[in-house]
Curated annotation (Swiss-Prot):
GO terms for cellular component: cytosol. The keyword Transferase does not apply. The keyword Ligase does not apply. Pfam families: RuvX (PF03652). The lineage of its organism: Bacteria, Bacillati, Bacillota, Clostridia, Eubacteriales. SUPFAM superfamilies: Ribonuclease H-like. GO terms for biological process: rRNA 5'-end processing. Its EC number is 3.1.-.-. This is Putative pre-16S rRNA nuclease. CDD domains: YqgF. It is found in: Cytoplasm.
Length: 137
């Protein structure tokens, strides 16, 4: 059983995949967004390659727990993904995942240009790992 984690951005989608047993998450790519059809095509290829059964999408929430405009966009994207790929979609609170990703990359002494290229992939790993930790309990 493989689970895919997504960090949705305006320009890119960070993608992470679980190991076959569903214990650990690993970032695999960053999709440069084009349009809905091409985005779905890229996701379909990944889902087919890894035999994905569930997709976890980071849900941006406000610090008080409410869902704002970005969260609504993520939920719409989730519906689109579920319908287009016929794969179950779950949402995971992504508050502070990008902050955590930046902090980890700074501690690893990565250059600004390198951080910019991989931040969404790293954030998707945090999203998916949080979900995996929760379902394993």
């Amino acid at each position: 059983m493989r689970i895919l984690g997504l960090d949705l951005g305006k320009k890119t989608i960070g993608v992470a995949i679980s190991d076959p047993l569903g214990f650990t998450a690993q970032g695999i790519t960053t999709i440069r967004r084009a349009n809905k059809e091409k985005d779905m095509e890229e996701l379909r290829k990944i889902c087919d390659e890894y035999k994905v059964e569930t997709i976890v999408i980071g849900l941006p929430k406000n610090m008080n727990g409410t869902i704002g405009p970005s969260g609504e966009i993520a939920m719409e994207m989730g519906k689109l993904v579920e319908e287009a790929l016929n794969i179950k979609v779950e949402f995971w609170d992504e508050r502070l995942t990008t902050v955590a990703a930046h902090k980890a990359m700074l501690e690893a002494d990565l250059s600004r240009s390198k951080r910019k290229k991989i931040v969404d992939k790293v954030a998707s790993t945090y999203i998916l790992q949080g979900y995996l930790d929760r379902i394993s309990k």
